[in-house]
From Swiss-Prot:
Keywords of this entry: ATP-binding, Carbohydrate metabolism, Kinase, Nucleotide-binding, Transferase
Gene Ontology molecular-function annotations: ATP binding; kinase activity; phosphotransferase activity, alcohol group as acceptor
Functional summary from the UniProt entry: Catalyzes the specific phosphorylation of 1,6-anhydro-N-acetylmuramic acid (anhMurNAc) with the simultaneous cleavage of the 1,6-anhydro ring, generating MurNAc-6-P. Is required for the utilization of anhMurNAc either imported from the medium or derived from its own cell wall murein, and thus plays a role in cell wall recycling.
Gene Ontology BP, a term: peptidoglycan turnover
Annotated NCBIfam families: PRK09585.1-5 (NF007141)
Sequence similarity: Belongs to the anhydro-N-acetylmuramic acid kinase family.
EC identifiers of the protein: 2.7.1.170
Pathway as given in its UniProt record: Amino-sugar metabolism; 1,6-anhydro-N-acetylmuramate degradation; Cell wall biogenesis; peptidoglycan recycling
Signal peptide feature range: none
Binding site for ATP: G9, T10, S11, L12, D13, G14, I15, D16
Protein's name according to its UniProt entry: Anhydro-N-acetylmuramic acid kinase
Enzymatic class: transferase
Species per Swiss-Prot/TrEMBL record: Methylobacterium nodulans (strain LMG 21967 / CNCM I-2342 / ORS 2060)
Length: 374
């Protein structure tokens, strides 16, 4: 099937769009004449405006009042309508730019915008109206990927590991491998030499750094990690942050974007605060090794963190292993999650499992998602 994946992550930067070909089990990988892996398909991006981002930040704050998942307090209804409309625009622009029509697309995987994720309370909410998006575009849409897993006692995250394994196999990787996605929250997929999966959120990703830079420097993120590189981490504060019980809890486990706050480093300078938060992300990742059945031979890094030179330097130092940005092996650092939700949509369409005991802690493999037809 030709499927489009849509991802709007907790970093609140914009909408990633990616087209792949998948049957739900395997992913079509193209190679160049030199054997190098080529793009899985075309990609696109629709940046959020400052106004969009401000509305979504308000939605995140006001989502704290949600008691049941259908609640839309404060600006949540407006934000949901905005998210749906912007995703429709993103797909329409993508189709036009690539000479495609809705008839060329079999399915869309629409993640939506997470505003609250508290699986311990049986609560996860991703705003965005899949049925409305399907009617507008004239294409079947799978959305609401996390709720069934959470309702069954799972963490509802991470969802991408089954795609990571399919992509690793299609790419010819053998042996133990770790795929680290550093978005707003960081998550890792550990693939053992025998193919067994273990996946979980390692800790904060870019969200705290982005919030810090927005507040202190009026910039949306720390470009290339240059601000962090100019500072010095506060070791005492880092030690205190890493005492949090989340880091010793056995996986599967997951985090909400707001589980930690950038204000914990409030007294520090802009540079030292960025350095401390960047080191916090990396050292939380290093703690993942405590749960690995075998040390990964290689770490492949995707998400915004793959474009942060200081974060990559620290990862290589603390992991003592080969650390490679996804782009360097022909994968897409920026669009890996969007590609994953295209693959997950096909799996859901075919009734295949998308979550597993070793990824979300759910009691048995289960499918998920809600399908809407135009």
């Amino acid at each position: 099937m030709r499927a489009i994946g849509l991802m709007s992550g907790t970093s609140l930067d914009g909408i990633d769009v990616a087209l792949i070909e998948s049957d739900g089990e395997t992913v079509r990988v193209r190679r160049g004449h030199n054997g190098r892996i080529g793009p899985l398909g075309p990609t696109g991006y629709r940046a959020y405006s400052d106004e969009d981002r401000a509305l979504l930040r308000r939605a995140l704050a006001e989502a704290e009042a949600i008691a049941v998942r259908t609640d839309r307090p404060g600006c949540l209804r407006e934000a949901e309508e905005r998210v749906t409309r912007l995703h429709a625009e993103a797909v329409e622009n993508f189709l036009t730019e690539n000479g495609l029509t809705p008839a060329d697309i079999d399915l869309i995987g629409f993640h939506g915008q997470t505003v609250i994720h508290r699986p311990g309370q049986g609560l996860t909410v991703q705003i965005g109206d899949g049925a409305r998006l399907s009617r507008h575009l004239g294409i079947p849409v799978v959305s609401d990927f996390r709720q069934a897993d959470v309702a069954a006692g799972g963490q509802g995250a991470p969802l991408v590991p089954i795609f990571h394994r399919a992509l690793a196999r299609a790419s010819g990787f053998e042996g133990s491998l770790a795929i680290l996605n550093i978005g707003g929250v960081a998550n890792v997929t550990l693939i053992a030499g025998n193919g067994d999966l273990l996946a979980f959120d390692t800790g904060p990703g870019n969200a705290l750094i982005d919030d810090w830079m927005s507040e202190r420097a009026s910039r949306p993120f720390d470009a290339r990690g240059s601000t962090a590189a100019a500072g010095r981490p506060d070791e005492a504060l880092l030690a205190w942050l890493l005492v949090h019980p989340y880091f010793t809890r056995r996986p599967p486990k997951s985090l909400d974007r707001n589980s930690f706050s950038h204000r914990l480093v409030g007294p520090l300078s802009t540079e030292d605060g960025a350095a401390t938060l960047t080191a916090f992300t990396v050292r939380a990742v290093a703690r993942a090794l405590d749960f690995a059945s075998e040390p990964p031979r290689r770490w492949i890094v995707a998400g915004g963190g793959a474009r942060n030179d200081e974060m990559l330097r620290l990862l290589r130092h603390h992991l003592r292993a080969e650390v490679t940005p996804a782009d360097e092996i022909g994968w897409s650092s920026a669009f890996l999650e969007a590609q994953a939700f295209a693959h997950l949509a096909v799996r859901a369409w075919n009734g295949l499992p998308i979550t597993f005991p070793s990824t979300t802690g759910v009691s048995a493999p289960m499918t998920g998602g809600v399908t809407a037809r135009p």
